[in-house]
């Protein structure tokens, strides 16, 4: 695509003016694409197939997208004046807009993770060694991919064969054995830190929404209590700002997914006070009233460890001023690697594989939707339309910071999708219809996600509802029970 570039300079973060280099935009887009297996991961007929046809190769597509970035930058006439060039952040925002608005959501998410990871390195929140690039380092993912391959559940077809062949019980047992072993290892690491002489006073269990933090926190606590440790647990949801202080968007939704939805300053003050042996007056939040309704005195006994289950537990301002040596961080995310067939891509001549990885966040969306319907009285469509806030929050201050973790756990299981599917299909299924989305034609994120998850649900062999209630098949302490019901573990947010 022939584009006349009208941008002469850009303003760097140190306010220096340097020449605008479109090739740099091509390189960063291509790098984000390459790190997730190429643009083919985002091929969507009817949305971006013409870009694939125009670009033909990954390099050509990156060039085409960079041209669109230039078109957007040219549209702001201020940038034509040498004293008012676009800033680095403005250019990054435009790159993200171009990727997202043309359906390249996986590349956009990867670009966002790179962007904020670099931000946290620049801020000194993490060293370069903790920069996790696209959020899923190969050395972390390869063992899980290998495990699924060994158990013939790394592909949709293989998983379906297991379900149809009546062999799911063995897969459930093996998967939970692996998960429990990872919890044993996490507990050993905590004890080892203490035996080494570290004065641990705080344990965080953090990770993206609906990853299984609550079940994991309970199970880890049980192990550590057997080792003689004592805990003080705080409900950090009590630190939400009052509802009136959360602005609404054009569909009357609120962004509760950003760390700044919490009173970070007060939380930090209280955590520091508790670690110093001081008593605090902790707020008690009434979700029914949408405000803080009371204060509760809390103090930490000298031998108690603060145990905190929070989405944003790694967000640096929360623990500002607290010695890292007293903190142990556990990161959990549902990351079950499952591959599906790649669709045909006419006119695209880039390297392409036969399969592509399903999205981890799509399984978490199903988990959250089911929880929201059953325990929060939220309609399924509202959860789908809200999910862009969830992704923005976790790509800013959760996934890019996972390198801070002392231990990384996988809350995703190969049997999750078969267990979740029966709640979303049929006459009583809660999955929104295409018609439900017609009133929101501008919500491309929701439209794309709906199409992708619908295809995934159609392709996976599900259990029956009766099978999902069978505790001999899926035990009551399995993570997925947080969402499908039948959990034998007390789940505060489900009460």
Predicted regions mapped to residue ranges:
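Conserved nucleotide-sensing/catalytic segment adjacent to the nucleotide-binding pocket
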Residues: 232-234, 241-290, 305
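Conserved NTP phosphate-binding and transfer environment spanning the P-loop NTPase/kinase superfamily
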Residues: 194, 316-495
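Hydrophobic positions on the alpha1 helix immediately C-terminal to the Walker A/P-loop
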Residues: 215-220
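Long, C-terminal-biased catalytic regions of enzyme "large/alpha" subunits
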Residues: 1-135
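Glycine-rich phosphate-binding loop used to anchor ATP phosphates in small-molecule kinases
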Residues: 195-197, 268-324, 379, 383-401
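Hydrophobic anchor at the beta1->P-loop junction of P-loop NTPases
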Residues: 203-205
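Conserved glycine(s) of the Walker
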Residues: 212
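Charged, amphipathic alpha-helical linker segments immediately N-terminal to NTP-binding catalytic cores
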Residues: 135-185
């Amino acid at each position: 695509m022939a584009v006349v570039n009208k941008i002469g300079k850009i303003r760097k973060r140190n306010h220096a003016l340097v020449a605008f280099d479109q090739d740099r935009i091509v390189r960063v887009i291509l790098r984000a694409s390459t790190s997730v297996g190429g643009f083919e991961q985002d091929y969507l007929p009817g949305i971006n197939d013409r870009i694939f046809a125009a670009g033909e190769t990954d390099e050509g597509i990156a060039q085409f997208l960079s041209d669109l970035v230039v078109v957007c930058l040219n549209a702001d006439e201020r940038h034509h004046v040498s004293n008012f060039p676009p800033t680095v952040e403005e250019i990054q925002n435009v790159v993200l807009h171009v990727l997202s608005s043309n359906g390249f959501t996986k590349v956009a998410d990867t670009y966002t993770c790179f962007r904020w990871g670099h931000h946290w390195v620049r801020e000194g929140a993490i060293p370069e060694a903790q920069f996790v690039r696209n959020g899923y380092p190969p050395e972390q993912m390869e063992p899980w991919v290998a495990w699924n391959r060994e158990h013939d559940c790394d592909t949709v077809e293989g998983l379906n064969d297991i379900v149809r062949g009546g062999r799911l019980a063995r897969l459930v047992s093996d998967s939970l054995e692996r998960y429990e072993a990872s919890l044993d290892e996490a507990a050993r690491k905590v004890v080892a830190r203490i035996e080494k002489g570290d004065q641990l006073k705080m344990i965080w269990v953090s990770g993206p929404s609906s990853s299984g933090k609550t079940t994991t926190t309970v199970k880890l606590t049980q192990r550590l209590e057997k080792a003689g440790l004592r805990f003080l647990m705080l409900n950090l949801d009590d630190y939400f700002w009052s509802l009136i202080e959360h602005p609404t968007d054009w569909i009357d939704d609120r962004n509760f997914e950003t760390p700044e939805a919490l009173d970070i300053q007060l939380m930090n003050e209280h955590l520091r006070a508790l670690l110093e042996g001081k008593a605090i007056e902790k707020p008690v939040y009434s979700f029914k009233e949408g405000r803080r309704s009371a204060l509760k005195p809390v103090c930490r006994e000298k031998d108690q460890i603060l145990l905190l289950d929070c989405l944003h537990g790694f967000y640096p301002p929360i623990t500002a001023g607290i010695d890292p040596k007293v903190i142990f961080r556990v990161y959990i995310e549902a990351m079950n690697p499952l591959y599906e067939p790649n669709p045909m891509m006419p006119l695209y001549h880039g390297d392409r594989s036969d399969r592509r990885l399903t999205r981890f966040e799509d399984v978490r969306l199903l988990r959250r939707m089911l929880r929201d319907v059953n325990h929060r009285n939220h309609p399924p469509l509202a959860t789908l339309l809200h999910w862009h806030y969830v992704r923005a929050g976790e790509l800013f201050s959760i996934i890019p910071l996972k390198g801070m973790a002392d231990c990384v756990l996988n809350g995703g299981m190969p049997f999750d999708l078969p267990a979740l599917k029966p709640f979303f299909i049929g006459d009583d299924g809660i999955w929104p219809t295409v018609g439900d989305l017609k009133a929101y034609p501008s919500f491309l994120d929701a439209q794309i996600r709906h199409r992708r998850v619908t295809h995934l649900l159609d392709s996976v062999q599900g259990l029956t509802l009766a099978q999902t209630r069978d505790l001999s098949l899926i035990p009551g302490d399995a993570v997925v029970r947080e969402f499908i019901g039948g959990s034998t573990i007390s789940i505060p947010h489900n009460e």
